[in-house]
Regions:
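Hydrophobic alpha-helical transmembrane segments in multi-pass integral membrane proteins
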Residues: 66-74, 101, 128-139
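Hydrophobic alpha-helical transmembrane segments in multi-pass membrane proteins
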Residues: 1-83, 144-194, 342
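Extracytosolic and intramembrane catalytic regions of membrane-associated proteins
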Residues: 213-343
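Alpha-helical transmembrane signal-anchor/signal-peptide segments
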Residues: 191-212, 306
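Membrane interface segments of multi-pass transport proteins and intramembrane proteases
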Residues: 34-57, 83-87, 95, 102-122, ...
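Hydrophobic alpha-helical segments embedded in the membrane of multi-pass proteins
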Residues: 3, 91-99
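Conserved hydrophobic/aromatic beta-strand scaffold that supports enzyme active sites
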Residues: 87, 101, 211-213, 258
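Divalent metal-coordination and catalytic microenvironments
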Residues: 21, 67, 88, 123, ...
Length: 343
């Protein structure tokens, strides 16, 4: 049934295959159908109330296991209190859904009385309060977990191998589990070494801000125009970059007008810069909407690339792009094309 459902949806909407919600929904459904009966067989409660909450626990655990590799890959975090949330929210959600059906039915035939709307409103308010309360325990949310697409696939391989071994233990399945564990370890070591032996200079796509990351191995230096340490720790673009490159932010520096990286001289012009004609550069970075005559700069300088980050006005970026096209110099608008990287 799940396969037919997936086939029919993708037949009409093939791009849903790349939708995060679609992937998470069907991963959760698949593992609920497959795993929940196995978990449920471990204990049979004697009364209906215990059975109700036991079903919530088994369904929650199966769904969480099924979506774990995908969640870590896309969101780089894992909620440690998902059991608590589900035990408190799901019973209330059932009541809210029932009230919602009643309200919609009455609304279809007549005007809604206030006594009919209030219980639904209170139910939603209580549910949101519970979710907010659980989310406030930030120490139980495991964040900044690095992952890659290959690691996610290998993690699913390990998960499926463990479940098959748990269902029926045998020598072949034991070897399969051990092989999957070794494969995951090899991928982790490879990723760590790959990023540890590389370096790059990246202009991030940060709206109204200039944020540059200079990564040498697994250490990142954040270069910005006034970002405080607290802001850097809370900036999701920076944290996602650090997590995605298996690295850590170790240094913070203010933005300067000249930078050097991998034999490239980078000239950075902002709204307070004064351009000198003999100030040659391989790459020109424009930030904070500087009032410069780009055509004159390009004639005197002839850089290999002109980059405009996301802190510039869109109208200026469009003018700069036209100027670069006329001068036949490559132009990269970070707000449109995404981050710019020098390796």
């Amino acid at each position: 049934t799940l396969v037919v459902s997936i086939f029919l949806i993708l037949l009409f909407q093939p791009y849903f295959l790349f939708d995060v919600g679609f992937q998470l929904s069907y991963a959760a459904l698949f593992f609920i159908v497959w795993l929940q009966p196995m978990f449920a067989n471990y204990w049979t409660p004697r009364n209906k109330i215990a059975q109700f909450f036991w079903d919530i626990i088994t369904v929650s655990f199966a769904a969480q296991l099924g979506t774990l590799p995908l969640s870590i890959y896309y969101f780089h975090q894992f909620p440690g209190l998902f059991f608590v949330t589900n035990l408190l929210v799901l019973p209330l959600l059932s009541v809210i859904m029932l009230l919602g059906v009643i309200v919609m039915t009455i609304a279809a035939f007549s005007a809604l009385p206030i006594w009919c709307i209030k219980p639904l409103e209170w139910g939603i308010t209580i549910m949101n309060s519970i979710i907010h309360w659980v989310a406030s325990f930030e120490s139980f949310i495991f964040t900044n977990i690095s992952s890659t697409f290959i690691l996610m696939i290998a993690s699913y391989g390990l998960l499926i191998a463990l479940i098959l071994w748990w269902k029926k233990k045998s020598l072949i399945r034991t070897i399969l589990v051990l092989s999957a564990i070794i494969l995951v370890q090899i991928i982790l070591i490879k990723n760590k070494l790959e990023f540890g032996n590389s370096k790059e200079w990246v202009v991030l796509n940060a709206s109204k801000k200039t944020i540059i990351c200079q990564r040498i191995g697994n250490e990142i230096e954040v270069i910005s125009n006034g970002l405080q340490s607290e802001e850097i720790q809370k900036n999701m673009t920076l944290q996602n970059y650090a997590t995605g490159t298996f690295s850590a932010i170790t240094k913070e520096s203010p933005l300067k007008n000249v930078a050097y990286f991998n034999r490239n001289r980078i000239l950075i012009l902002d709204n307070s810069s004064v351009y000198l004609p003999n100030n040659q550069a391989d790459i020109l970075l424009l930030t904070a909407s500087p009032k410069v005559n780009l055509e004159r700069i390009l004639k005197n300088n002839r850089p290999k690339m002109v980059v405009a980050d996301a802190s510039n006005y869109k109208s200026l970026v469009n003018l700069w792009e036209q100027t670069c096209n006329q001068q036949k110099i490559p132009f990269h608008a970070v707000a449109e094309k995404g981050f710019y990287r020098i390796k």
